Each structure stands twice: as structure tokens, then as C-alpha cells.
Amino acid sequence: MLFAIGNAGSNIVETIRKESENAALKKIRNVFADCDENDLKKHKAEDCQLIHLNKDEDEFPNEIFDGIEKLVIVTGLGGKTGTKYAELAAKSAVDAGVTSVNVIATLPFFFEGNNRINLATSAARKLTDINGMNVTIVNNEEILEKYPDLDFFNAFDATDKKIMQIVKDIL
């Protein structure tokens, strides 16, 4: 299962869904979860499941992971939805007995401000403290440093492609 949480995660998984030529990625179950119902509607398709999250909930429904052996959660950290629900979903998946739980999370750009960066860093630490799963952190700022000619929008594309490769390697 490829599980997108929040706007950043959903945008990344949508790119993977549309652009990947990989047979395994074409067959995988795509799930999009967000607190914003309008954002969820952007990902409505026959091969996708949509989950509207209640921003006041502090639990995650375990039943979503019934029968799942391999899970890849994709999210951005530093905002509200991904920061909160990546941890809840990961714990829920581990508790539900998912054999392979992987979280791929992005860190914000510097220009997004210290509040988002601090929130993301704290969330990344919490994710790495969960036993029974793998966490990969993709730092958007490092992508800009590696490819200084990229503008802001192309940096997102580079991040999406990097994460697509990580997902392929996991599957």
C-alpha cells in the first residue's frame, strides 16, 4: 500500500501514480488521507481510496491496514496534517501487524520558516523512535543545494522523483 498523508504526501503520490512506468507501482493500492476534503477530491480515481481525517482525532483507524504486508507512508513534515498523522498512522500500522512499515517524509525548505522546520524536526525524531519500521527523511533544502539551478517548482519535481525511486527500491 502506498499511503499519502496531507497535501505534500498526496502531491508526491499523485506524481508517482501518474508518472511511474514501474509495474509494481502501477499495481499498488493508493490511499490518500487528508483533513481537507477539497484536497482529497483532487485524487479521486477508481484505483484510489480516500480517507477524510478529522483534525480533532488523536487516533488512526487500524482497520485500514488489515491484510497489508507492505506499507509505504509518504508525507511532508512541518505542516499540520502530515506532522500529526504520519506518526499516528505508523504506530497504527505497526500495532495492526503490518510486516514492512516504511515512512518517507520531507522536511520543509528554509524559506518556510523556523516554526515549520522545528515542527518537522520534532516529528522526524518521534517517527524514528517508533520500533518496527523504517524512516527515510528527504530534506528539500539539500535538493536545492545539490541542484542550484532548480527553481522552487522544479525542486518539488526533483523531490517527487527521488521519492519515487525510494518507493521502487522498497517494493
Predicted stretch roles:
Residues M1-L171:
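Tubulin/FtsZ superfamily GTPase core signature
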